[in-house]
Amino acid sequence: QVQVLDLFAGTGNISYEFASRGAKQVTAIDQNRHCIQFIQKTALELEMNITAIQAETLPFLSQQKTSYDLIFADPPYDFEFDVYTQMTELTASLLNPKGILIIEHDKHIDLSRIKGFTENRNYGNNVFSFFSF
């Protein structure tokens, strides 16, 4: 019964993964119209419960009222530190109790100073930082 929000979804690989593992609902957000159309088409073909929305992430988060069990974000690696901070602040109010935020980022960025940080997991040049609030 997990509700997932996939931010900066791109072509939807993470969304498909969560949907294939039994997530009740996956919402994919990306600002690129072609990516959203691709996700919609693929989700329909694979009969997956994925809602794809074309939107800029930070404005979307600031207007969002739905709550989620898991939020995954794979933002551009050139984000400034304060944008990561703003993103975690906006997602904190959208997580259900015991909900988790996961941010994928470059290994040269240290997000451990951001409120809610719990751990890092390293995968080559990529790091997944976990947050709970």
Describe the predicted segments one by one.
Residues 1-133:
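Class I S-adenosyl-L-methionine-dependent methyltransferase catalytic core
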